[in-house]
Regions:
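Conserved ABC ATPase "signature" region
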Residues: 40, 111-112, 163-180, 289-290
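Conserved ABC transporter NBD signature motif
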Residues: 104-112, 124
Length: 424
């Protein structure tokens, strides 16, 4: 279901005292031209220290985000997917500066905002907003909807044309809510309506970048499509740039232009939507895609190869050496255990951090691995490997049997000896 554009959405927005002539809520009032880099992240890290003892000395760290690089262009939507605990939400809070990074750089419109203080970030809060995951805890239950949605105007000392109340009612109508509900409280709304209120609050100051952290995960399936379509409509109408964090691959496919796949604090693949879903190159991405249910019984029976990953996700406190996915990867070799693969563009618009990528026939750069040799090995060696494995298993089984038999004979002799000495 697509949410129709509201008539109020086309009205000229409010102006601010600080910047006359800037429209709040007007269409396409962005400084960055479409296609220009709006957000650039380089080597971003966030390590949460682990402290123990009376003196609270640091004994380790949780490597939630451990060196990621990506760019977001004006007007596009970047989707970020991965398992729970991979660092998606932490990354979202880092680029909105709700968390202080451990290392790395965050640039917004070419300006380094990595270490700006509260005062330095205040003007940028108008341009960078966040939609939080839980609509039940992100709204203050003691405040009315008018107070919640109007808070950004008061915090930024912005006076909309016609007053705050009129602008808040316009925003409520834009997100598909009744403007007359201005004086109601959050508990009087459903989960989907509360998320719409959160979206209205994020759009209040006409931001350039909106980071949406699992915007539909807490909602019923029947409501998810409405909220997703609303975000899409608002992007078309207002020229917004999104970073959408989610674990639902269907949602990400519907709204994203490019998709980043995260695993254990790292981006393992970054590609255009069509390329990623048609031919994923990282084994982890391929495993994620195989878990997406296919609603067509005929296609489901024809494409029923579900990849079940072995083991659990390693702890971010002590991640594996080399490629972090090698402990669960069916293609892992020695180079995967010792050398961390860089995120390289192996196809136009498709970057992957893997020594043995999927759906890739050409030779990879020499600093990773010779993929032509890996491909030949994959086609020619399996029988020999299986035979060698079988021989090894048989030899090991024979050795264990001999040791067991010798141990049993020794135990029997000891029992006989004890029995004889007891008779004497």
């Amino acid at each position: 279901m697509s949410i129709p554009a509201q008539a109020d959405g086309a009205e000229p927005g409010a102006t601010t005292g600080a910047t006359a002539g800037e429209a709040v809520g007007a269409t396409l009032t962005k400084d960055a031209a479409p296609g220009e880099i709006l957000l650039k992240v380089t080597g971003l890290q966030k390590h949460f220290p682990i402290r123990k003892g009376l003196l609270q000395r640091q004994t380790g760290a949780v490597r939630a985000v451990d060196g990621i690089d990506f760019e977001v262009r004006a007007g596009e939507t970047l989707g970020v997917v991965g398992e729970s605990g991979c660092g998606k939400s932490t990354m979202g809070r880092l680029i909105t500066r709700l968390l202080e990074p451990t290392a790395g750089k965050v640039e917004f419109e070419g300006k380094d905002i990595t270490h700006l203080g509260v005062g330095g970030m205040r003007p940028l809060r108008r341009d960078v907003q966040m939609i939080f995951q839980d609509p039940y805890s992100s709204l203050n239950p003691r405040h009315t909807i008018g107070t919640i949605v109007g808070a950004p105007f008061r915090l930024q000392k912005v006076t909309p044309e016609g007053g705050i109340k009129k602008e808040v009612q316009r925003l409520l109508s834009v997100v598909g809510l009744n403007p007359e509900h201005y004086n109601r409280y959050p508990h009087e709304f459903s989960g989907g309506q509360r998320q719409r209120i959160g979206i209205a609050r994020a759009l209040a100051l006409n931001p350039k970048l909106v980071v949406a952290d699992e915007p539909v995960s807490a909602l019923d399936v029947s409501i998810q499509a409405q909220v997703v379509n609303l975000l899409d409509d608002l992007q078309q109408e207002l020229g917004l740039t999104y970073v959408i964090i989610a674990h639902d691959l269907s949602v990400v496919r519907h709204v994203s232009d490019r998709i980043a796949v995260m695993y254990l604090g790292k981006i393992v693949e970054l590609a255009d939507r069509e390329a990623l879903y048609k031919a994923p190159m990282h084994p982890y991405t391929k495993a994620l895609m195989s878990a997406v249910p296919i609603p067509d019984p005929k296609r489901r029976s024809a494409k029923s190869e579900r990849i079940l990953l072995r083991g659990d996700v390693p702890s971010p406190i002590s991640p594996p050496s080399g490629c972090r996915f090698h402990t669960r990867c069916w293609k892992a070799t020695e180079i995967c255990r010792t050398t961390e693969p860089p995120l390289l563009e192996l196809k136009p618009g498709q970057r992957v951090a893997c020594h043995h990528p999927e759906n890739f026939e050409d030779q990879a750069p020499q600093d990773t691995v010779l993929l032509s040799a890996a491909k030949d090995a994959g086609e020619l060696v399996p029988d020999a490997v299986l035979a060698e494995s079988a021989e090894t298993s048989e030899a090991l089984a024979a050795e264990v049997a001999e040791q067991t038999e010798a141990a049993e004979e020794g135990a029997e002799a000891e029992r006989v000896e004890k029995s004889d000495s007891g008779d004497k």
